[in-house]
Amino acid sequence: MKVVLVHHVNALTKEQDPQRHISELGQAQAKRLGARLKAIGFAPERILHSEAQWTTDTATVMAAAMGLAGRTAQAAYPINTGDAVAPFLAEIAEAKGDLMMCGHVDYLLRAASALVCNDEQRKVVEFKPGNGTAVCLEGAGSEWVVTFAWRQDHAPG
């Protein structure tokens, strides 16, 4: 099973847009990352995001670029800084296929650490904030590894 964790793309400031939709740059970042994941055949059964507009937009634009519109959903549990990762880990354990989560850096870092080394505080990956960085974890049960990570500044075009 694969789990791709995506730190949201560039968003507008509160002054530019109180709801903080993603910017034009963010739209390009999300399209590029979605196309890249599609090119390697990644087609998650669900694309989760938080209640924040910029994570919703990131997930929606990426899903469209992957040809997977309609597979996005707000996580049924909070996925913000400091929130428990146990509900996400339980969803992964019960999933029938691959998953993707577009979220916030603290939560994603702790989820990756919990999967790979069963310790949320032991950092196993790093995200470049706000730029659509993706990290792919592959495994099952208590055996997970990081298989790749992409940053926008590493992506072609």
Please provide the spans of the model-predicted regions:
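Short phosphate-binding loop-to-helix
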Residues: 77-96
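Non-DNA-binding regulatory cores of transcription-related proteins
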Residues: 95-100, 105-133
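Residue-level preference for short coil/turn positions at secondary-structure junctions
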Residues: 43, 94-95, 130, 142
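A polyampholytic, Gly/Pro-enriched intrinsically disordered region
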Residues: 92-102, 144-152
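A short, polar/proline- and glycine-enriched secondary-structure boundary/capping micro-motif
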Residues: 16, 156-157
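Domain-level recognition of soluble alpha/beta enzyme cores
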Residues: 119-147, 152-156
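Active-site-proximal alpha-helix that buttresses catalytic centers in soluble enzyme cores
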Residues: 2-83, 109, 120-122, 128-132
